[in-house]
Amino acid sequence: MSDHRQSLESDHHDRAVAALREQYAAIPAGAPVRLAKATSNLFRFRAEQSGGLDVARFDRVLSVDTATRTAQVQGMTTYENLVDATLPHGLMPLVVPQLKTITLGGAVAGLGIESSSYRNGLPHESVRELEVMTGDGEVVVVGPEDDLFRGFPNSYGTLGYTLRLKIDLEPVKPYVRLRHVPFADAAECARVISEVCAEGSYRGEPVDFVDGTVFSGREQYLTLANWADSAPFTSDYTGNAIYYRSIQRRSVDYLTVRDYLWRWDTDWFWCSRAFGVQHPVVRRLVPKRYLRSDVYRKVVAWDRRHRLSARLSKAVQEPVIQDVEIPVDRLAEFLEFFHREIGISPVWLCPVRLKDRAGWPLYPMDPDVLYVNVGFWSTVSLRPDEELGSRNRLIEDKVTELGGHKSLYSDSYYDEEEFWDNYNGPTYRDLKKRYDQAGRLPDLYAKCVLRR
């Protein structure tokens, strides 16, 4: 990016910050503050609200520095746009969450993960600097030694909003080679995850990316991928072919780097089947531009609002849309419980180890433990005697029992005491007093559990 272009982008950012501060100042004292956003990847649905701070101008990549392998990015920039800006330079973010419209600010204030997380940790661990508008309306710049920087991940916009980030990048190669390795036994699968993540290789070949797909208790696959300078062929899963189905059919595959990064977006992992677009006839009729996770999410939001599927269903359907981190040595136990009590399939696996040993107080993972993110996104039919939320509570209890953690992007059912035990209530309250003394932003428990 030229010096002139960087100067223009910097000026744009400064003007956007000034305009946002004016918006904040215009909100009556004591009135709650929130964002007005066009997109979301959260699954905590609540009643529509008008107004809010307009952050539409915070969606740009401000600079890409190839010498330092860093990028300056605004908080509402999507990973899709960031990747499009960095790949021409042979670079990418250290962790690129699976869905195109996840924003940098959202991934840092919440949690993100992908197949590079076993070596690069979580997205916020590659952030060097954050510019934040706090709940008090102040704009501050913080780094790794600051309490707000450490406490920002898993705060979900209750301490402030990300305006700008400086993040690390890493080099890429043109192609990614994938090996889909089957396992009939979850314990053996977990053992290999531990081995691969410790050694960075499998059977003598390097492994740069690790994730997995569980189709049943007797059928799970690890996808072990590595960079490649060339490819004998490349597959395309952005049209008629469906990526997750290829896992069972191919032992080796090749993708371009961009298609690898977005391999899960076209079918929202496998959740597009709920909309009928995996049927071959329907698939051919749907324009490719609509085969995207953000399109499906809008359909789900509309359905939640109007309760169409709930009215059509004979049984009460409980949404079970969660990502949980389980210590790898308890993974098989969790999967056995999950198959028995919940019964959703497929299930996604993604190993993660913290990169920064200093840790992140609001999501207190042990830096000495390799965790496996287990993702599952569907609905479960409840028996007449079951209350809505009962299956999610079963999962929450099991995750706590096994020493795991649960992301807060979707429905949560913890009581308040348990919630603050899990998410470091004392530290959160100290941060809240310092950066949102008047309580203009919602409390984390109120936002994530009470949906306020």
Where are these regions (language model features)?
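Noncatalytic alpha-helical scaffold of FAD-dependent oxidoreductases
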Residues: 1-452
